[in-house]
């Protein structure tokens, strides 16, 4: 018996094949959703009936304290075949040595600097999504629920009977090569390059590969949950609009086979063995759930007369800190857009920043770098370390004919945080690190000669 979509489930047994052709989603950001796979499996008018329909168990998944203000109070009620206490046994230690957690300070000897990397190579050995997580930076302190970690994932096999949840934070996933399918306890998210997904803290999932090899970026958020930024004077529209976020409809599998559940908790990994799939939520309602977003639906705003505005106008999601206006994390993109400013140096300007910037490139070319920053690559410009256009980029932009120009076929992004991003040993010793990155500014000339015109020879 197989039915996928809004009423989607898979029951595995003799003569029954799995079908994962299509899955359905519900639009909106932060909505109080409700979804069921079997008619009447979602209770109405109450959360915890004495005997839920179909013999299910009622269970609450809380993403905030009970007493959090209504606007930030997040929880969902799950109606499942077995309660989650049946999805764990005795834990044993597990090892994923390349996935690091803050604080992770001083585990390498690389000197301070601006860093850039070519893409992380694809693995040669069989590697799933969790095994393929490689930490590049960590920031803050997971025990204080502040900060983040920036990772790259590479994988060439699906998680079949292995499942995972992260108690340390939510995961923002940014694919760069290859499509994946996140099969979660609350529904299925199909994800391709150009889209992002957010998997909440505590959500059980496994990652299946749609393509042979996949690579991408992950921001692990230890702090307050990612949310939409305030638009301020921009008004009620533009940037990331709530209707474009998609939360999966309920989907479950009833699978009686040996499985493993891997847990990340306070920086350590643990594994337990169970005799069935934990992805058994038949119905759910609430506002604590995974979602995805197509970056092509981001509606950018910008300067329409002169000057280059701050990159904060490109913020897709933000995780606030306790200090107003200062983010624990900002997720920022640099999408296709028109450049029309007059008498203006149009690329991003030279900068020293109190925030620390981890950048990646999904596809195309970034307008501040003429060469060296390639799709799948990484750059890291930390707290108060100077950065900006390379010498060829400066030369080109300073002499450009300032006609309207469309930046097309490009998508760069940034994980920005208020905390210093501490480089991991893996990142420091990664063979794709460009030792000569600092040289991209070597040919910037002194143009001051005491005259108002300067020396542009």
UniProtKB/Swiss-Prot annotation:
SUPFAM superfamilies with a match to the protein in the record: RmlC-like cupins
Enzyme class: oxidoreductase
Keywords, in A-Z order: Dioxygenase, Iron, Metal-binding, Oxidoreductase, Phenylalanine catabolism, Tyrosine catabolism
GO terms for biological process, alphabetical: L-phenylalanine catabolic process; tyrosine catabolic process
Domain of life: Bacteria
Single GO term (MF): iron ion binding
Pathway note: Amino-acid degradation; L-phenylalanine degradation; acetoacetate and fumarate from L-phenylalanine: step 4/6
Cofactor or coenzyme needed: Fe cation
Active-site residues annotated for this sequence: 308
Entry annotated with the keyword Iron: yes
Pfam families registered for this protein in UniProt: HgmA_C, HgmA_N
Residues engaged in binding homogentisate: 366, 387
Catalyzed reactions: homogentisate + O2 = 4-maleylacetoacetate + H(+)
Family: Belongs to the homogentisate dioxygenase family.
PANTHER family in alphabetical order: HOMOGENTISATE 1,2-DIOXYGENASE
NCBIfam families for this protein: hmgA
Record's protein name: Homogentisate 1,2-dioxygenase
Organism: Mesorhizobium japonicum (strain LMG 29417 / CECT 9101 / MAFF 303099) (Mesorhizobium loti (strain MAFF 303099))
Gene that encodes the chain: hmgA
